[in-house]
Structure formats: structure tokens, C-alpha cells
């Protein structure tokens, strides 16, 4: 039996710090466990059973971890939903996941409005609507759990997180893994072993800082793993470069999960600001989610030294890992296969590519990480390959392995835009624009943005009865704002007489996209 696991640590060392909220209010392990247990009892009393889904739309907050830890010890699936989504987008995930309970926040007016629109659109049962702030039609979390005991539940079994990841069809798909029977501490500390890939050890006064939204798969994975490893977690409401340096210095932060956009913003700080704060406590400042320009990473290594780590993985699984020293030998690599993983580069004819030859990147599907796309067996099967009696999966990325086994990415999922570490799928945006009567055809793609990596651009072919004008441009922008999350909104829209398609209707999107990338060091 493992000695790790948040619930064990909370029972044996209840006075240790678990969470530092964005307000810098401190929660001990014992306090966090007490609220977690109350929510567990309340959800079960409400009728949520093992295998059922609890969905959340929450900002970075202690309630995020209370919700996660309650699901994780009860056999529930937690479905974290991006709080930037519009009402119809939230409604789709609530309905598709079959959520029995919905925990939301109204601290931000737009978030409250989107959540209320979502539950109204699908007639979600009001008794299953719980909020962390005052919201019409929702029961406040404090009231929902007020009559419940803080004692550990008698029956405990490990739950799972089911993240939704968009596909080329534009509709999000739930990445669903089977529940693993067993003590939650044992099961969850097994998954927390991912931290060992970055030489992070249990306890040892480690402190993890969260500067990205917790609805991102990896951010919740790494920060919850930190709790199961006996670490403290410092929360930021949103990323602010100087604030992160302040918190690293104050709390002697040792680890974080970051994206290249955050590196860029840190490096943009004046030298006198950077010099004010001591970052020598950092040991594993891990980055992923988007390509990192070589010059940006080199600058971060010069500043933070060997604490800079990188990995390659997906919501579906992974992956590779590389430390600063190895990366410096092979700049641009995303690393070697981590323990237990295997990477293969497969040609279009199904054969294995030779070193330094590009192909589709496939990763071995481990027993503990087997998944299916909820409700889409066709997609599940389509993106798998049996090779040497092992099952591999792909997310469509193109790359190659060098002779030493280091992976280099050349391109990624067809047409996907990565902006500030967030995956944005053009098909969903295109489908939205096609609902407008003026739009005959549309292409959405990413163009360079120095800060965010990429930004969204739309090129629209108008119907015959419409002419391009500033008024129509404003109308289309307003239409997008009403139907899409802010991060998916085009920064610019161009009108075109005819989009480049072949006789079969295939869009030559690269003819539109490539001119913007001609002078860029990377088109990933």
C-alpha cells in the first residue's frame, strides 16, 4: 500500500498547508478534507452514484479542488468545463456527458449568464444546480453541504476526470477512461507518479503554483498530483507575470505547469522587475500545450536554469519528456518517450518511418490510460493502430525521431490553432459563421501572434445578395461574440470572392494560411 495520497496526508497531517487561494487565504489539509467529505455526502444523498457525472464551470478556486477531491473518492466522473464557453457550448457538454449535478460560479457576470443559459436550454434539473456564489436557480454550495458530516465516507472508490476535447467535426468529445476499483489514495497516487518523470519527489517542502486555468487537462492533473504527493498548491486567479514572480519568491515555489505564452510575458518584464524576485527555489517549471520558440526557451533556461522541463502529450495520453540539459543538445525537441511510453512514427502506408523521416506520431496506449471518445466509437477506432501486437493512438501530429530517439514535431492536428496554450478548432467556428445568412463559405485558420503564438483569422465568401462592408463586418463580429467563447473569436475577418476548393469540395486551406507563415521560424 502506498503512503501517498491527499486523503492519507490530510488525516495524518491535517495542519499542513494544502491550498493558498488567489486572495492568499490559506486552507489546511484538514479544512480541505472536511469540505470535501461534506460535498461527497451531499452528492450521494442527492442521488449521484458511482459512474455518474458531476460537471463544473469554476474559476481557479479552492472549490475546484473540493469538487475534484469529492468526485475522486466517490467513483464519480468530474467533467471540468471551460468557463469561457458560451451558454450553448456549456449546454452541449452537460447534455452529452449526462451530468447529474452541475457546480458553477457566478463570480464573473458573463460566467453566470452562460451557466444560466445552459441549464435553461436543456431544462437541467434545478435541484442539481449548485453554485459557489449567489445565482438565481442554483443552490449555494454552503447550503448544499451544510447539514452533512465532515467524517470520511464509509464507502470510497476512485473516480476519474473526463475532459472534453474538440475534434475536427467541431463538437467536443469526452475522453472517457474506465473507473479503476480500489482505494482512492492508492489509485490516485499511482497516477500522480507522472511527477517522477520530472524528478519531482513526494513531500520535501515542495510547492506547486497554478497560473493557468484548471479546466485545462494538464493543469488539473499536475496540481492534483502535487496534492497527492504531499505538496502545497498556490493558486493564481489568472496569470500575471510579476505576480507569479512575487508568489514564487514568497512561497518558495518549486514546480508549475506553464505554456510558452507565459514564458514570453515573463521575459517581457523589465530587468529591474525580474531582479526584485528570487526564483532559485524552482526545480521543475514544466511547459507543454503549445510549441515554444527556441529563442524563448533558451532565454528561460538562461534565467531559471535546469528547472525548465518540457513534455509532449495530449488529453488522451502520452508521451515524451526532456530536461533543459538534453534539450540544449537537441534544440527544438519535445523529448524522449517517458517511462512506460513508446513513440512510433508511422508512414501513410502503415509502415514505421526511419529516423529523421517525417510521419504521423503514434503513442502506445497504456493499460491505465486506455480511453474511448464518449459516444464516438468510430473516432476511437480511427485514431488507433495495432503495431507489433501493441495498441497505439495518435492525435494527428506530424513529426520525426532522430537517431537518439528524440521526438521533433513538424506540424500538428490538421488546421488546429493553438493560442496561448489553448486548443481552438476552426471547424466549430466555421460552423457558427455558416449559420449567418450572409455567409456562403468560410475558412478559419491561425496566423502568427508574437504573444499568443497564434490568433484566429476568418476568410468569408459571401452569398450573392450581400456585399462586403464595414457594417457587415461588425455584424459578423457581433454574431460570433453571441455564439462563441471569447478565445475562439477571430481577431480579423477578410472577404474573398471564392474560397479555393477542388471539384470534390476539399478546401485548400494552406493556400490561405501559408503566406502569413512564410517568414516565421515555425509553422507549428
For the regions a protein language model found, what residue spans apply to each?
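Conserved AMP-binding/adenylate-forming core of the ANL superfamily
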Residues: 15-61, 65, 69, 86-91
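Conserved AMP-binding/adenylation subdomain of ANL enzymes
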Residues: 183-207, 211, 215-255, 269
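Structural core segment of the AMP-binding/adenylate-forming
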Residues: 45-46, 73-147, 154
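Conserved AMP-binding A3 loop
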Residues: 28-30, 160-189
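Conserved pre-ATP/AMP-binding loop-to-beta segment of ANL
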Residues: 14-15, 129, 134-136, 143-166, ...
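Conserved ATP/PPi-binding loop(s) of AMP-dependent carboxylate-activating enzymes
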Residues: 340, 351-385, 424
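AMP-binding/adenylate-forming catalytic core of the ANL superfamily
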Residues: 41, 85, 91-92, 102, ...
